[in-house]
Structures are given as structure tokens and as C-alpha cells.
From Swiss-Prot:
It comes from the Viruses. Residues 1-19 form the signal peptide. It comes from Human herpesvirus 8 type P (isolate GK18) (HHV-8). The keyword Repeat applies. GO terms for biological process: symbiont-mediated suppression of host complement activation. InterPro entries: Compl-Cell_Adhes-Reg, Sushi/SCR/CCP_sf, Sushi_SCR_CCP_dom. The keyword Signal applies. Residues 288-302, 312-321, 424-440, 450-476, 484-495 have a biased composition (Polar residues). Glycans are attached at N63, N111, N197, N255, N275, N299, N334, N371, N374, N378, N426, N445, N455, N483. This is Complement control protein. Keywords: Disulfide bond, Glycoprotein, Host membrane, Host-virus interaction, Inhibition of host complement factors by virus, Membrane, Repeat, Signal, Sushi, Transmembrane, Transmembrane helix, Viral immunoevasion, Virion. It is a single-pass type I membrane protein. The lineage of its organism: Viruses, Duplodnaviria, Heunggongvirae, Peploviricota, Herviviricetes.
């Protein structure tokens, strides 16, 4: 029982304390006032205090009092503290001032803002000003007023064109007129004006290559707006020839470099077409092409075939035992007959061919078989023999070549005959082919003629110029001899001056010959000496200037 009484006592005491705290008045609720005697904490209920106006407020009364009431409220103060007012902010040129707060717009805590007229923009640190207590304790605005400046635009840019007037900058509503260079068309407005925020009233125009290509409509022609050249925004109207109808827009306009809408088309008029404005009109006669082909709508005629292109082939109805024979055409080719004919001709030529007397061709042919050697120089004829490996290696037919005649008045000379001996190495029989004697007109001069001899290294004819003694001895006729006892066939060269040849042209001396190495060395040393002298001279001049003129 005692414990219960003690608990109730504690709860009652706590409630009374809380109730007393709630009955106090806060100093913060005194708007525009503050305690004349500063103190901390809240004011108890029923207590009366002296007040004064806060900063930014003013009153005409000397003493102001207020009492704390039940519920934590204050009684009405005996005098009113009113807000102080800031001075008139004034007007702004090319703009206006906007006041906020109604009647208290110029009083303590109020704010004002500035707005410029169209075509102007604000210039200043702050666009909003507040009424506040200044450094001296007087009411003042928070900042200096801004001002309105006219809008400006930068210089425009246009390629392949120009604009007028040309200025460093343009103010609001200043107009600029554009024009393009020759050969270009202006696409866009011809004039624009400066707007707000460094912008223009429209997008910048451009200068494009002027004109469109000449419009060509097949089976059509222009009836209005014909011109050789078409500029931007220029139009042309088309019509079709008789027998053709227009598909598309008859009038097209040049848009920069393209036609808008696209070019129309002229098509053949169809009498069954319900959209045909002229029913019953006949189709025009199509033009014949040079090759004879005729082309019409839904009509195509193949060109006639040539008679020689027609081939007749045998046909069988049923049960063919052998394939039919293909008849040859007028220009046909019989492969079997031709092959047999060619084979027979080759055999006849091999049988009837005789060795030729041209010495150069014969030597070349024998060299290819590899059966010739060089005999002693004292021999008086040229003996060539070869051993064929088969019957097919008979002496081939060598075409004769006529030796040119250089001098018709020169005496006739006889060349050594060529003897060709062929046969198997183990057989006593041999086929002898004696080359006919060649007669040439040799040209004589003081130094002797030029003749062809067999080169010992290459085993081929070469051109030599004999000495006077050789030239004199070569005038004697040559006698053909054959060495039949020799087992090894060989080539014997006796006289190297047999075939006259055209003399070679002399070798010209070189146009430019490099200078001797000694002269070039002297020139190099001379250049080095000159450069050294120049360097020493410059050094002496610099030293002289440093010593006497510094």
C-alpha cells in the first residue's frame, strides 16, 4: 500500500513540472520585438517584460511592455514596431522594375527585380535587389541597379557569297542582305535581322551551285519555261508527242540542283486505258531499227536467219541401229580427209627434199647434230658428215637464200663447195649431198674485201677482213676434195675469205669523257682552300671588331 502511494506522488509531481514548462512564453514569438533587458530562457506565465523594436523596425513610443498569458502566448504590446523602408530604387532605362510584396514592397526584407525591354539585355552583377540595413545602420538596397544594353549579334558567315552592310557587330533589328558569287544560287532568305541572345531571325542562307541540268523527256517537249539553263526556283512545263500520254506532273521546278517533282514520262497511248483522254487514237508507227528488228508493244519479230546458218540433219523415226551421218555445210571441214592429206604432203616433202646450198644454214643444222670438228687450216675444202640415227634423219630441205650482190662491176669469184656426207656409222654406204658452187660478185678495194669464216670457238660463220696476201691468194679457184678414209666425220676450214659481207660501221667516240682523276683532285683541293680562306677572313674580322669597337 505504501508503494502505491509513493508511485502516485511521483507521477503527480512530474505532471505539474511539465505543465509549468508549457505555460512559459518564448522570446522568439515576439516578432519585431525583443526584450529591453536581455536574458536567457523563456518567460513565466503572468510575468510582464519591457520590449523594444528589433533592427529594421521602428516605433514612436518610448516604452513598450507585454505580459505572458496562459497557454504560452503574449499580450498585445503597448506600442507597434513597424518595418523601416528603403529608398526609392528609381527607374531603369530601356527596362522596368518589378516590385514584390504589395504595400511592403519597399520595406525591410522586401525584394525587387529588373526586366529590360525587347531588344535589350541586362548587364550587372545581380538582377534582384533586397531591402536591408546598411553598414551605417540605415536602410539600403543590397546591390547597385543593373542597366539594359541593346542586343548584339556577331558577323554572319556565308561561303561562296557576301553580305551587306559589313560591321564588326550588329545591334537588335539590324538587317543583313546576302548575295552569292557568280555561278551560285542563294538558298534561303535574302535578308535576316539580329534577334535576342545573339541569334538571327532565321537560319543562315547558303550559296549552292546554280541551276539544274537540262530536263530531257523522251517523246516530250517543253511548252512553257524553255531555257538552256535553269536557275533555282525556275519552272518548266512539258507536253508529249502525238500518240503518247504524260505520266507524272507536267510542271517541275528546279530546287537548288534537283528537279521537284521528278521528271514526267511520256508513254505510248493505250486505247483500252480508261484514263485515256483521246480514245480511239491509233498507235504510232514504230521506227525500224537499222538491223531490221521491229519493236512494238506486245509485238516482237525475230530477225531473219541466214541461209548458211541452216543445217540439215538426218532424222529417224524409231529403232535406229546406227547414228545418222552429219552432212557437211558449204564451209564444213573434213577432219579425216584433211589429216590424211597433210600426212601425205609431209611424206612427199621428206622424200623429195634436197639439201640446200646455203652455207650458213647448213653449218647451223650440222652444229645442232653435234658431228663436226675443226680440221687443219691447210685443207682446201669444207667437209661435213653426220650419222643419222634412223631413216627419218635424212637431210632436210633447207630453203635457199640468195646472197646479196654488193658490186655489180666487180669480178666473179667462186666459193668453196660444201660437201655433206651422211650414213650409218657401221655401214659402208653413205648418201652424199654436194652443195652447188656459189658465185658471188666480190667488191674489191685497196685493203681487200670482207669475208665470212668459221669461228673456232662458236663454230659459226663470222666476218673477217683478210690481209693483202690473203686477198691475192683468194682469187684462185677452189677445188673440192673429199676425205673418204676418215672414220670420224669432221669440218675442214681452208679459206676463211669466201662470203663477202657488208662492212660494219665505225664505232663513234663518246661525246663526254670524264676528266682525269688528277684534275678532279686539284679542283677539290682548290675549293677546300677557298673555304678555309673565307673562314679565316671572317674570324679575323670578328677579332678585329671585338678588340677595337666593343
Amino acid at each position: 500500500m505504501a508503494f502505491l502511494r509513493q508511485t502516485l506522488w511521483i507521477l503527480w509531481t512530474f505532471t505539474m513540472v511539465i505543465g509549468q514548462d508549457n505555460e512559459k512564453c518564448s522570446q522568439k514569438t515576439l516578432i519585431g520585438y525583443r526584450l529591453k533587458m536581455s536574458r536567457d530562457g523563456d518567460i513565466a506565465v503572468g510575468e510582464t517584460v519591457e520590449l523594444r523594436c528589433r533592427s529594421g523596425y521602428t516605433t514612436y513610443a518610448r516604452n513598450i511592455t507585454a505580459t505572458c498569458l496562459q497557454g504560452g502566448t503574449w499580450s498585445e504590446p503597448t506600442a507597434t514596431c513597424n518595418k523601416k523602408s528603403c529608398p526609392n530604387p528609381g527607374e531603369i532605362q530601356n527596362g522596368k522594375v518589378i516590385f514584390h510584396g504589395g504595400q511592403d514592397a519597399l520595406k525591410y526584407g522586401a525584394n525587387i527585380s529588373y526586366v529590360c525591354n525587347e531588344g535589350y539585355f541586362l548587364v550587372g552583377r545581380e538582377y534582384v535587389r533586397y531591402c536591408m540595413i546598411g553598414a551605417s545602420g540605415q536602410m539600403a538596397w543590397s546591390s547597385s541597379p543593373p542597366f539594359c544594353e541593346k542586343e548584339k549579334c556577331h558577323r554572319p558567315k556565308i561561303e561562296n557569297g557576301d553580305f551587306k552592310p559589313d560591321k564588326d557587330y550588329y545591334e537588335y533589328n539590324d538587317a543583313v542582305h546576302f548575295e552569292c558569287n557568280e555561278g551560285y544560287t542563294l538558298v534561303g532568305p535574302h535578308s535576316i535581322a539580329c534577334a535576342v541572345n545573339n541569334t538571327w531571325t532565321s537560319n543562315m542562307p547558303t550559296c549552292e551551285l546554280a541551276g539544274c541540268k537540262f530536263p530531257s523527256v523522251t517523246h516530250g517537249y517543253p511548252i512553257q519555261g524553255f531555257s538552256l539553263t535553269y536557275k533555282h526556283k525556275q519552272s518548266v512545263t512539258f507536253a508529249c508527242n502525238d500518240g503518247f500520254v504524260l505520266r507524272g506532273s507536267p510542271t517541275i521546278t528546279c530546287n537548288v540542283t534537283e528537279w521537284d517533282p521528278p521528271l514526267p514520262k511520256c508513254v505510248l497511248e493505250d486505247i483500252d486505258d480508261p484514263n485515256n483522254s483521246n480514245p480511239g487514237r491509233l498507235h504510232p508507227t514504230p521506227n525500224e531499227k537499222p538491223n531490221g528488228n521491229v519493236f512494238q508493244r506486245s509485238n516482237y519479230t525475230e530477225p531473219p536467219t541466214k541461209p548458211e546458218d541452216t543445217h540439215t540433219a538426218a532424222t529417224c523415226d524409231t529403232n535406229c541401229e546406227q547414228p545418222p551421218k552429219i552432212l557437211p555445210t558449204s564451209e564444213g571441214f573434213n577432219e579425216t580427209t584433211t589429216s590424211n592429206t597433210i600426212t601425205k604432203q609431209l611424206e612427199d616433202e621428206k622424200t623429195t627434199s634436197q639439201p640446200n646450198t646455203h652455207i650458213t644454214s647448213a653449218l647451223t643444222s650440222m652444229k645442232a647434230k653435234g658431228n663436226f670438228t675443226n680440221k687443219t687450216n691447210n685443207s682446201t675444202d669444207l667437209h661435213i658428215a653426220s650419222t643419222p640415227t634412223s631413216q627419218d634423219d635424212a637431210t632436210p630441205s633447207i630453203p635457199s637464200v640468195q646472197t646479196p650482190n654488193y658490186n655489180t662491176n666487180a669480178p666473179t669469184r667462186t666459193l668453196t663447195s660444201l660437201h655433206i656426207e651422211e650414213g650409218p656409222s657401221n655401214s659402208t654406204t653413205s648418201e652424199k649431198a654436194t652443195a652447188s658452187t656459189l658465185s658471188h660478185n666480190s667488191h674489191k678495194n685497196d685493203t681487200g674485201g670482207i669475208y665470212t669464216t668459221l669461228n673456232k670457238t662458236t663454230q659459226l660463220p663470222s666476218t673477217n677482213k683478210p690481209t693483202n696476201s690473203q686477198a691475192k691468194s683468194s682469187t684462185k679457184p677452189r677445188v673440192e676434195t673429199h676425205n673418204k678414209t676418215t672414220s670420224n666425220p669432221a669440218i675442214s676450214l681452208t679459206d676463211s675469205a669466201d662470203v663477202p659481207q657488208r662492212p660494219r660501221e665505225p664505232t663513234l667516240p663518246p661525246i663526254f669523257r670524264p676528266p682525269a682523276s688528277k684534275n678532279r683532285y686539284l679542283e677539290k683541293q682548290l675549293v677546300i682552300g677557298l673555304l678555309t680562306a673565307v673562314a679565316l677572313t671572317c674570324g679575323l674580322i670578328t677579332l678585329f671588331h671585338y678588340l677595337f669597337f666593343r
